[in-house]
Amino acid sequence: MANDYLFTSESVSEGHPDKVADQISDAILDAILAQDKYSRVAAETLCNTGLVVLAGEITTTANVDYIQVARETIKRIGYDNTDYGIDYRGCAVLVAYDKQSPDIAQGVDRAHDNNLDQGAGDQGLMFGYACDETPELMPLPIHLSHRLVERQANLRRDGRLPWLRPDAKSQVTIRYVDGKPHSIDTVVLSTQHSPDIDLGQLREAVIEEIIKPTLPAELIKGDIKFLVNPTGRFVIGGPQGDCGLTGRKIIVDTYGGAAPHGGGAFSGKDPSKVDRSAAYAGRYVAKNIVAAGLASRALIQVSYAIGVAQPTSVMVNTFGTGRVSDATITRLVQEHFDLRPKGIIQMLDLLRPVYEKTAAYGHFGREEPEFSWEATDKALALAEAAGTEPVAALA
């Protein structure tokens, strides 16, 4: 890739139909883990006009009112009016959960001689990524895209823009010069709204109240292209506008396309599923590599075989930004991080009901106290082992 280029990422709000599905799935996961932390959960959700379908595989001793959890999640998001196409009070909720296959369970539950040798719940490959473009060590385009739709939700909730409705999408294009963010080129924001708002008034308010306060002043250089509701009217949205499904926003959930994705979604899955837990561990590893000053960009890939505890591969790529070799960093990762599935669960304390909060505005790059995978507590040890200087904030 050339050093001067445009790069774009997108995000969606909590009211987007796919995110409604993700949040219901993770709310159900949390409700189960709160009672039985060793549950096996793969909770999938479909939501459409006036309808929510809950399906998947759950093995647990917990007694959870799944229908009530789904309704409370829809209420929290803001779908509390039949005019919005789905109303938490009146929507139909169908439940069709099965138990986890015993063929899968025999590999996942096996302990061998060491209780950390729990097998992976499936084969697969997962990626983690970090870079020094933001204080959170995230790519700038996805970071800004998340903040835009998060602000849209905040202004909707506090009543400052009362004509906003829950569904929204954002997209940010950044101009890079010499491989670093230089300026903001284009911002797209489409928001659902009440039918009585004038489009000109909406566009002015969105630019002045949502977009401009979110953009870093140092990246405003020349004219930025603002595209607000470019198709015009956006009254029908949410699950009425599109059928929502768990796991359809995996790029929004991660790095906005700035890093590869192994293909496995996160929401609704307990941490025995390496699709989720190993991706969280990958973020933890990559963020600590960058925080340690070992590189300004770091990508890690890990892979697993079902029923086998040790990863089948570990790879680190620092894209030529490493202060030491990628082979050295890979060795340090294997020395300082336990990437067996149960080792990850213990390292990041993942048997907690913390997942509903992850299901909107990104699983990574948010300094939430529950997000243990965002900690940089290994950075100093990595820096010492590699002979590098950690970033100033950690020194």
UniProtKB/Swiss-Prot annotation:
Location in the cell: Cytoplasm
Pfam annotation, one family: S-AdoMet_synt_C
Keywords: ATP-binding, Cytoplasm, Magnesium, Metal-binding, Nucleotide-binding, One-carbon metabolism, Potassium, Transferase
Primary enzyme class: transferase
EC number: 2.5.1.6
GO MF entries: ATP binding; magnesium ion binding; methionine adenosyltransferase activity
UniProt pathway annotation: Amino-acid biosynthesis; S-adenosyl-L-methionine biosynthesis; S-adenosyl-L-methionine from L-methionine: step 1/1
Residues annotated as binding Mg(2+): 18
Named cofactor requirement(s): Mg(2+); K(+)
Residues holding ATP: 16, 167-169, 233-234, 242, 248-249, 265, 269
Family membership noted in the UniProt record: Belongs to the AdoMet synthase family.
Subunit structure: Homotetramer; dimer of dimers.
Function (record text): Catalyzes the formation of S-adenosylmethionine (AdoMet) from methionine and ATP. The overall synthetic reaction is composed of two sequential steps, AdoMet formation and the subsequent tripolyphosphate hydrolysis which occurs prior to release of AdoMet from the enzyme.
Protein name: S-adenosylmethionine synthase
Organism (species): Paraburkholderia phymatum (strain DSM 17167 / CIP 108236 / LMG 21445 / STM815)
Gene name of the record: metK
